[in-house]
Amino acid sequence: MCSVCEGSAEGLVTRKRTHSGGGRSAGSKRKWHRRMGGLSFLIFFVIGSLFSGLMFALLSYAPSYRSRVTPHYLPDGRFLQIADEARVLEPYLSAAVRLPDSLNGTPAGKQQQTARSNEQEALSSLKVAVEMKLMGKDDKALRLFQHAMALSPRHPEILTKYGEFLEHSQQDIVTADHYYYQALTVNPSHSEALANRQRTASIVEHLDQKRFERLDKKRDALSSVHALDAGLKRAEKEAYIQHIYHSVGIEGNTMSLAQTRSILETKMAVDGKSIDEHNEILGLDAAMKYINATLVNKNDFITLKDLLEIHRRVLGHVDPVEGGEFRRTQVYVGGHIPPGPGDLSILMSRFEGWLNAEQSFLMHPVRYAAMAHYKLVHIHPFSDGNGRTSRLLMNTLLMRAGYPPVIIQKQHRHKYYDYLQVANEGDIRPFVRFIADCTERTLDLYLWATSELSHPVPLLAQEEMGGAIGEREHGFGREGGSTVHEGSGTGDSIRIGTMW
């Protein structure tokens, strides 16, 4: 073979060897990639399995963890919406809900330690008070009892012993019965409180009934006054202004009686007072005109629609968007949480049913009106204006029964709130008596204003007039003209209606 052919043959062999070696190298790479792909899939599968198992374990563990940890449903204290009006617990709701200790600024452990220390000191004071009572030193005993009550106001033994002291040494059986009632609320099996309550309950009920009979007699005496009597007309017009002045004043409005009168008569602004204070007066004015025109002599039930219409006018100048609408947010007051917005529909439906139930109509009108006020102010269905609306409802019910509207004086606001709190704790009778006392003072003022005889000035008139019987600022005097313009309209007086 020639050298050229031999060279060509050797080159061909070399190329075949090179090609064969490259093929083996590419095959190895493909096998390596297949192996790495399978390994990557295995790694991802293992990691995914571990992650899934971990998540399953966490989800399975979470419920048991939540069950052992006390939940914090409430936001931080600085985000709480604090309402300015009092409310009480509804009788048909099971119990009050209190804010967690973490929100009241004092550690729970320190609170418990302070409570135990106060209780020990209270019991020591109680022991000495009982000794002073036996020695006939009633003044010292009274101060010691009051000190013990201030330290531990919910201790059943202190409540019972203090009640016995009031009943036997102070002849105050009504307050004594209330303390026996409170003691049984804390400890229903307290033997002494049970025995005392069995003795006093019927007596106190009889006294309450006599109070209502006295109110009925005064109401009947006022009903005998001719509707066109000049004194009655002046009294009605002044009561209209006084009701607005005191009702907004209870909620913190700083307008004086003269300024309130000026706004209602002239509709002119008062210097130095906020727009909201003006609008609160105008809103209550509109609500009372609506009540006089529609509800006082309405021969039908009072419905939720009526309540919403009252509230729509109460807030009509302050917050027209919220006026006549149930609140849509949770609100908080002190240590109590009112019903949530989701419960308002059913609670207000129950309230409407109670308001128009035959059993409710059988109550004395003053008790019925006071309880309606109590129930509505607890449910707190509105974002604002609950107290004003509740007082308007109470007076609507009283006027439909022939009573004048009750004037709850702003200087008695703390007593008013205290009695609501007592009702919150389970005994509504003190609040009913408070409303009865306000009703009697108002009746006395009407009777004095319409009487031709020279009677002493009623207590309410003395407080408002500062002892000046004929003072023009008060406007209830029998002599001279009324301080309210005669042309202010029929809606500018509170009229006494009749029961349907």
Swiss-Prot record:
* InterPro entries tied to this protein: Fido, Fido-like_dom_sf, Fido_containing, TPR-like_helical_dom_sf
Where does this chain mainly localize? Answer: membrane
What does it catalyze? L-tyrosyl-[protein] + ATP = O-(5'-adenylyl)-L-tyrosyl-[protein] + diphosphate; L-threonyl-[protein] + ATP = 3-O-(5'-adenylyl)-L-threonyl-[protein] + diphosphate; 3-O-(5'-adenylyl)-L-threonyl-[protein] + H2O = L-threonyl-[protein] + AMP + H(+)
Q: List every stretch annotated Disordered.
A: 477-500
* Superkingdom of origin organism: Eukaryota
Q: Which GO terms describe its cellular component?
A: membrane
- Residues recorded as binding ATP, renumbered to this chain, are 251, 333-336, 384-391, 416-417, 424
What processes does the entry annotate via GO biological process terms?
A: protein adenylylation
Q: Where is this motif: Inhibitory (S/T)XXXE(G/N) motif?
A: 247-252
Q: Which residues form the active site?
A: 380
What PROSITE patterns does the entry give?
FIDO, TPR_REGION
| Record bears the keyword NADP | no
Q: Which GO terms describe its molecular function?
A: AMPylase activity; ATP binding; hydrolase activity
- Which residue ranges run through the membrane? 39-59
Residue span, Fido domain: 302-437
Q: Does the keyword Isomerase apply?
A: no
List keywords of the entry alphabetically. ATP-binding, Hydrolase, Membrane, Nucleotide-binding, Nucleotidyltransferase, Repeat, TPR repeat, Transferase, Transmembrane, Transmembrane helix
Activity regulation description: The side chain of Glu-251 determines which of the two opposing activities (AMPylase or de-AMPylase) will take place. In response to endoplasmic reticulum stress, mediates de-AMPylase activity. Adenylyltransferase activity is inhibited by the inhibitory helix present at the N-terminus: Glu-251 binds ATP and competes with ATP-binding at Arg-391, thereby preventing adenylyltransferase activity. In unstressed cells, disengagement of Glu-251 promotes adenylyltransferase activity.
What's its job?
Protein that can both mediate the addition of adenosine 5'-monophosphate (AMP) to specific residues of target proteins (AMPylation), and the removal of the same modification from target proteins (de-AMPylation), depending on the context. The side chain of Glu-251 determines which of the two opposing activities (AMPylase or de-AMPylase) will take place. Acts as a key regulator of the unfolded protein response (UPR) by mediating AMPylation or de-AMPylation of Hsc70-3/BiP.
Q: What is known of its domains?
A: The fido domain mediates the adenylyltransferase activity.
Q: Which PANTHER family does this entry report, sorted A to Z?
A: FIDO DOMAIN-CONTAINING PROTEIN DDB_G0283145, PROTEIN ADENYLYLTRANSFERASE FICD
Task: Identify this protein by name.
Answer: Protein adenylyltransferase Fic
Q: Which organism does this record belong to?
A: Culex quinquefasciatus (Southern house mosquito)
